[in-house]
UniProtKB/Swiss-Prot annotation:
The gene is nuoH. One of its GO terms (biological process) is aerobic respiration. It comes from the Bacteria. Keywords: Cell inner membrane, Cell membrane, Membrane, NAD, Quinone, Translocase, Transmembrane, Transmembrane helix, Ubiquinone. This is NADH-quinone oxidoreductase subunit H. Pfam families: NADHdh. It comes from Anaplasma marginale (strain St. Maries).
Length: 352
């Protein structure tokens, strides 16, 4: 019995990173599966339809039926494709979509170590440059999409890949400036420090960063190629976009990567602007609810906003999309970073 306890302790210790990473991957995959179910159900409700309702009670087993269908389908390779790049592109996209979750803190516990209060996050890795890590991962995702469009040997796929790359790069600039203003107000690039510092700051700082939160939400819609900025996948123009020649599991990897990115950017916005795992209002009995539950509820709220936007707002033209990014969001974000820094410096509220 003592040996079994020691084995379990070793399995759950920090050294058993493989177990932790596999648990995180399985959790993200299940979340993605039921995000698709949630999207279909919510849009069906808004359009006065039933949505998935046949496979299992209330259609709850529909994601597993869809997964089984994709696994058993034949993978068709176009004659003009470049085989190695064609198959490695979805793997790159899928892997990078999962890699960003390594630094996301789903909660935290506070301990007193050697007389110093220390907050330990519930994340796989707690690195000092967590914000930069996430932005590096999101920037690399462009390569998988470009490889998919180029290697497919299809003009539709190539045009969709070019659109996606230019769109993602354009809005990453605005997102970087938004996160810079958050980092200035928190005084750190560690995600757990950002949540803790933002929680202890006065409410007027949240109001000061509210315009940046709006810019960030619109930017993550464009960054994840979601409606109304889903120009790379515009069915009426490009059939399906950069993944038009993919089927079976390669297509599923692109699909899973897109929805995993949706959850990831929603988690990022929760950390930067919604207080992370803390309750929305500072009332004592709300702290009885675990921080992980608050974090998940806030992420679900943002995912509902993603779905709501898809069901209600028409698609932008490509020139409107680029004009919004370069002529509106970029100058506004740059000016507002200066405003936030100036106000905090003038009122002596910059973190020491």
């Amino acid at each position: 019995m003592d040996i079994l306890q020691r084995l379990m302790a070793q399995l759950l210790s920090s050294g058993s990173s493989v177990f932790v990473m596999l648990s995180a991957i399985v959790g993200v995959m299940i979340s993605v599966a039921y995000l698709v179910y949630m999207e279909r159900k919510v849009i069906a409700f808004m359009q006065l339809r039933h949505g998935p309702s046949v496979v299992g009670p209330f259609g709850l087993l529909q994601p597993f039926a869809d997964a089984l269908k994709l696994v058993t389908k034949e993978s068709i390779v176009p004659l003009q494709s470049r085989n190695f790049a064609f198959f490695i592109a979805p793997v790159i996209t899928f892997t990078l979509a999962l890699s960003g979750w390594a630094v996301i803190p789903l909660g935290a516990s506070t301990y007193v170590i050697n007389g110093v209060e220390t907050t330990i996050p519930a994340s796989i890795a707690n690195i000092n440059l967590g914000v930069l890590y996430i932005f590096a991962i999101s920037s690399l995702e462009v390569y998988g999409i470009i490889m998919a469009g180029w290697s497919s040997g299809s003009k539709y796929a190539f045009l969709g890949a070019i659109r996606s790359a230019s769109q993602m790069i354009s809005y990453e600039v605005s997102m970087g400036l938004v996160v810079l203003s958050v980092a200035v107000s928190a005084g750190s690039l560690r995600l757990v420090d950002i949540v803790v510092m933002r929680h202890t700051m006065p409410y007027w700082v949240d109001l000061l960063l509210l315009p940046m939160a709006f810019v960030f939400f619109i930017s993550i819609l464009a960054e994840t190629n979601r409606h109304p900025f889903d120009l790379p996948e515009a069915e009426s123009e490009l059939v399906s976009g950069y993944n038009v020649e993919y089927s079976s599991m390669p297509f599923a990897m692109f699909f899973l990567g897109e929805y995993a990115n949706m959850i990831l950017v929603s988690a990022m916005m929760t950390i930067f602007f919604l207080g992370g795992w803390y309750p929305p209002i500072d009332v004592q009995f709300l702290y009885l609810i675990p921080g992980f539950v608050w974090f998940c509820l806030k992420v679900l709220l943002l995912l509902f906003c993603f779905i709501w936007v898809r069901a209600t707002i028409p698609r932008y033209r490509y020139d409107q999309l680029m004009r919004l990014g370069w002529k509106v969001f970029l100058p506004f974000s740059f000016v507002w970073v200066m405003v936030v820094s100036g106000v905090l410096l003038y009122l002596d509220k910059l973190p020491k």
